[in-house]
Amino acid sequence: EFGHALHGMFSNVKYPRFAGTSVPRDFVEYPSQVNEMWALWPEVLQNYAKHYQTGAAIPAELLAKVTAADNFNQGYKTTEYLASALLDQRWHQLTPAQIPTDVLAFEKAALADAGVDFAPAPPRYRTTYFSHAFAGGYSAGYYAYLWSEKLDADTVEWFKENGGLTRKNG
């Protein structure tokens, strides 16, 4: 959420209504997620993750554990997000006459049709409590989280190809 706050604070636009979290859903999660990503970069983490009494930088072995924990189970997390994004799309493609009464059967069929009906990796959010898709402004736009991860990866590659985190690179 800190990335959303930064996005809002640093927006310098003619029409504030179209700044911060009021940008298109395809982009809205990028500032938030890219800032979360930077927070765990070793070069960044060493600037703020210091011992509260001595000021010593985070030890390399602890940094390795933090990185390993962040990378752990990424496939599972991606599958959860993907299944939720697919359900979101399927619900929002229905006409009023097609809305089913059996929500669980609809979910099962929708996930099977998409090839992601794998019980050990269920959707992150089930329809009955999926507030992003029905009340959170993400109607048919939950995929924005996955798209933001792609944009994050592109950002990382750009920085790696252009000399890393430098003042010149922003």
PLM regions with names:
Residues 1-170:
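Cation-handling catalytic/transport regions enriched in His/Asp/Glu
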